[in-house]
Amino acid sequence: MKWNRIPLFAIALTFCALTGNAQTKTQLQREAQQVAAAVLAGPSMEKLEELCDRFGARLTGTAAYDHAAEWGAAQFRAAGIQDVKLEAITVPNGWQRGWAESYLYSPVSAQRKLHLESVSWTLSTPRGGVKGEVVVVSDISEAALRANASAIRDRIVLFDTEHVFADGFNKVYPKLIASYSIFKALGAQGLVLPDAVPNNVLGDWLDIDNGKGEILPLPIAEIGMEDALLIRRLLTKGPVVIGFSYENQISGPVSSSSVIAEIHGNDKPDEWIVVGAHLDSWDLATGAQDDGTGAIMVLEAARAIASLPHPPRRSIRFALWTGEEPGLLGSRAYVQAHAKELDHCVAVVNTDNGAGKPRGWIVEGREDMKAALEDLVPIYLKGYAADQVSLETTFDTDQGPFMLHGIPAFDLWVDDVAYNAVHHKSSDTVDKVDPAYFKTDGAIVAVLAYVIAQGEQPIGPHLSHAAVAEILKKAQLDGYLIAHGDWQP
């Protein structure tokens, strides 16, 4: 079928019931309860342990990720789903982290080791590393950098992140991307970004590249929070000299695959929804909260729905995405490859906020979807504490590429305290996951996916390009997405 794309202002805020009569609604309630029960009684934690402990870090383009993808495909098949495939994408550059070391040389009495790692998808330092005086930069506009050219040349640049990103990361992002070539042209030896998490625990800075898996043009490193504060204190007393070196492995284009498993609908098989989470993780972590929990929720939703005596009305495509961390590479490629089918995509349900106390759903700025869920949740998710709906527009994970095409998008919303504590850190391990919250979150995802797929009517229309643009502008995401290459006004 073809969707009539309508402008945002014309959307009625009333929810067209997903079921046509009381008997059908009662049957759907019963089936939703069966789906939830299957997830709650299922082996979520055991699967998460196998994914994270057996395969470890799952960086896009590495053998560890490929093995995890094959495992994910086998899990879908074991659930009785026959239509399972690996959809390959090409990442422009393969990248793997090597060793790194860094020292503070002056003005301390003896050189002191610093906590530092390369950021991802950056080239290695020159042989022997880089060493020089530190200069703090708080304004990365081209005019400010060129005005301070003499202070930047031959120096190691430490970002004053509080001021650099004072206007918000999304607004500053275009300047950030443009600044790399300017720093290189001005002769900076390298850039150092302070981490924001205590105890010198290192993670990996997000989105500092162009989101396409391309190699950054100069050495860029992340330094522990306390080490950065030490350098800033010492700079108030005089010059500070540090050095760092690291070696990364960089190859040419590499292939990496998303895992797609489809349960074909029995009434409207050409209409489909996506239930997805990313399978890849940063290499510094085993990716339990980010996003092993989400990947297992998708696997368990597939298993639970496949266990019902009949398939849903619409088809459901379960997706374990590759390449989310370096830039939504898998989901973006899927949307491009299946562009001619997108008119038939009813909704996308995504989970990439870890396993925490459930709150509800983020609906990417859509008032009509907020109204839909407020009508639906009390019927089918009563008792799951998932009754809140956020109008926040994020575009920070794999529902984003679908949302840009006006497709209704639902991102699981949970309390993110536990998630944020370990996000992209080496401490993002299985023991940080609360099993009860994990299973409850998984049941919520599975039930919403099934109810949307089983409804007599689509949960909502596709938005027009202009309506999506209105949402992005309101969220102040338009400039970021234009610079990122994801959006054309």
What is each stretch, according to the model?
Residues 26-30, 41-65, 75-79, 83, ...:
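Catalytic-core environment of secreted peptidases
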Residues 7-17:
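Bacterial N-terminal signal peptides
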Residues 24-33, 37, 49, 53-156, ...:
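Noncatalytic luminal/extracellular "stalk/propeptide" segments of secretory-pathway proteins
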Residues 303, 307, 420-489:
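His/Asp/Glu-rich mid-to-C-terminal helical/loop segments that flank catalytic regions of hydrolases
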